[in-house]
């Protein structure tokens, strides 16, 4: 890769199981990406989320412009939750994309929103672009299908690396992952129904 330096990832992760003894987490994926490249690699902030109110609180923290509280160098928002069409599920109630857009309220300029969840973006392109405009985000990324957590975690090593590296040009990440030179990447993209929507995306 020959682009700009990595931006950080601000990760919001819900509970994957009702039994809280189960320690399933996407955090090791983030730690791998951090550790593989050392000081030059990906940095992250990771928060476990149990309720919609907690998600709203930490989204507001992520987007804060208060002195000493800025996360402007964490330009990828990683939303790892159970999901379904147009929704993510922190555990204590569902959150719609409309809810999330209202919380963000246009403050996600220059950021990428990645939904690591089942079917959240199984929507018309124009509906997703409406969400994009409402949030002010540079790109919205996610799956149109139900996904298996292990497959998603494996692909997230590639996807998060690309999104954080090409954060100023998300379409370049899309091109990288879909390149005919990388058919093994393409297979993951198709299996997960991955889409990367930007303001210039066609229906």
Whereabouts are the PLM-identified features?
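Conserved beta-strand elements of beta-rich interaction domains across eukaryotes
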Residues: 16-17, 84, 120, 147
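Glycine-rich loops and low-complexity Gly/Arg-rich segments
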Residues: 35-37, 70-73, 101-104, 138-141, ...
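Short His-Asn-centered micro-motif
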Residues: 79-80, 90-91, 113-121, 143
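Short, charged beta->alpha transition segments
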Residues: 64-68, 75, 96-105, 124-129
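A domain-level signal for caspase-like cysteine endopeptidase catalytic cores
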Residues: 1-74, 88, 110, 115-116, ...
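A short, glycine/acidic-enriched catalytic loop
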Residues: 81-112
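Active-site-proximal C-terminal subdomain of hydrolase catalytic domains
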Residues: 120-203
